[in-house]
């Protein structure tokens, strides 16, 4: 009784083996067709990058197991058009999982290859190892990465050098300004001189911005050697031509532009002495100016200019206080001035009563009757017009004939 079930089990097991062998044959046949399609697609789509996984997948059918189906989505994924890098990375991840399941029970030498593939690398190093170029010693990606590693320390060194360059530029700008003022040149003179010497015209604004560190770092680095060269030439030129200054004065003026006269600085005690002298005599004569210059050990021209400037300053200080108030302007026909009234004597005889009593009165009383019953006795008032001409407008206006 026990043998019959065993025989049936063996028959079922044998039939199962036959079915498995048939399925393996069909799988091997379909796999070979698909791998051929896969290799053709890779050769047409990616001619310069043949994949090594197609060769690894063409192993004998006896070594394959039922897990071969994991490669179907892999081959379908490769046939879909997409970006090369993303497809190759996904292809590698799928192939690694399939190979781990396929070759672990057979103990082949493929895990060593997998270990080489699974080494951690930065960036795209994984794709560069799995996909190689035949006939080339190394891929361009590896060389690109190597060049990137080479360029990195140079960039860091440039960044670290910038603060020192900025400090040097600041120091040079300060020293340049001090030496330029000491030589007596303006910023405009420096720009003109550099244009004549080196062919690059610079405006006064450019030199001013350089001294104030308002230019860009690149422009300041370009301008620094030119300014340094000009400064050295300007300082060395007077010492070389000290023996013949008159012959080379025109040449120096053309080379270095207009040379500004140095500003005269007067000490505090000398200024106080000059102030005292100005309070005593704001406008000294030429002899007095010479005496003051000798006493203070100064040039006569400097003392004279100081007194001129001091007088102008005094005028600016006192001018608003001493301005006279302007008298109102009136027409000469309307109201006479006070001076004309003082110099004029007027005698008017009029009759303001029936008794014909005469009395001096104001001009208005003589020109018109003071009461309704009064009569005008003298039609022409006696007026002393000394200092006035007969044709003056005031006289004609006040004349009695204008009222008739």
UniProtKB/Swiss-Prot annotation:
Keyword Magnesium: no
This protein's record includes keyword Secreted: no
Family: Belongs to the POU transcription factor family. Class-2 subfamily.
Keyword tags: Activator, DNA-binding, Homeobox, Nucleus, Transcription, Transcription regulation
Gene3D superfamilies listed in its UniProt record: Homeodomain-like (1.10.10.60), lambda repressor-like DNA-binding domains (1.10.260.40)
Region (Disordered): 1-29, 44-67, 346-367
Subcellular location: Nucleus
Any single Gene Ontology cellular-component annotation: nucleus
Protein function: Transcription factor that binds to the octamer motif (5'-ATTTGCAT-3') and regulates cell type-specific differentiation pathways.
PANTHER family named among the record's database cross-references: POU DOMAIN, POU DOMAIN, CLASS 2, TRANSCRIPTION FACTOR 3
Species per Swiss-Prot/TrEMBL record: Xenopus laevis
Residue ranges: DNA binding: 259-297
Protein name per the record: POU domain, class 2, transcription factor 3L
InterPro entries: HD, Homeobox_CS, Homeodomain-like_sf, Lambda_DNA-bd_dom_sf, POU, POU_dom, POU_domain_TF, TF_octamer
């Amino acid at each position: 009784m026990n043998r019959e079930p065993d025989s049936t089990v063996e028959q079922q097991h044998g039939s199962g083996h036959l079915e498995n062998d048939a399925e393996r044959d069909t799988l091997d046949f379909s796999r070979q067709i698909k791998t051929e399609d896969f290799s053709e697609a890779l050769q047409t789509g990616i001619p310069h990058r043949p994949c090594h996984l197609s060769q690894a997948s063409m192993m004998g059918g006896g070594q394959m197991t039922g897990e071969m189906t994991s490669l179907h989505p892999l081959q379908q994924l490769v046939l879909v058009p997409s970006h090369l890098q993303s497809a190759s990375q996904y292809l590698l991840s799928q192939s690694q999982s399939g190979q781990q399941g396929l070759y672990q029970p057979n103990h082949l030498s493929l895990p060593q290859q997998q270990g080489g593939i699974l080494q951690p690398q930065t960036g795209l190093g994984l794709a560069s190892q799995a996909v190689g170029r035949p006939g080339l010693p190394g891929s361009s990606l590896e060389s690109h990465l190597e060049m990137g590693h080479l360029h990195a320390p140079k960039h860091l060194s440039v960044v670290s050098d910038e603060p020192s360059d900025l400090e040097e530029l600041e120091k040079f700008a300060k020293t340049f300004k001090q030496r330029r003022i000491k030589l007596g040149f303006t910023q405009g003179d420096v720009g003109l001189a550099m244009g004549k010497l080196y062919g690059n015209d610079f405006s006064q604004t450019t030199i001013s911005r350089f001294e104030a560190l308002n230019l860009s770092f690149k422009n300041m680095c370009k301008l620094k050697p030119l300014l340094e060269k000009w400064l050295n030439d300007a300082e060395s030129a007077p010492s070389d031509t000290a023996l013949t200054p008159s012959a080379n004065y025109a040449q120096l003026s053309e080379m270095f532009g207009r040379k500004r006269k140095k500003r005269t600085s007067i000490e505090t005690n000398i200024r106080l002495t000059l102030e005292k002298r100005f309070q005593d005599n704001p406008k000294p004569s030429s002899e007095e100016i010479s005496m003051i210059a000798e006493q203070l050990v100064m040039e006569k021209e400097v003392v004279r200019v100081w007194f001129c400037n001091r007088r102008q300053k005094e005028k600016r200080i006192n001018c608003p206080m001493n301005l006279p108030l302007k008298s109102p302007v009136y027409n000469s026909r309307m109201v006479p001035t006070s001076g004309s009234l003082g110099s004029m004597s007027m005698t008017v005889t009029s009759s303001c009563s029936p008794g014909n009593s005469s009395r001096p009165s104001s001009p208005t009383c003589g020109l018109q009757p003071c009461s309704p019953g009064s009569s005008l006795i003298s039609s022409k008032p006696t007026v002393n017009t000394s200092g006035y001409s007969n044709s003056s407008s005031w006289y004609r206006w006040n004349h009695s004939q204008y009222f008739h």
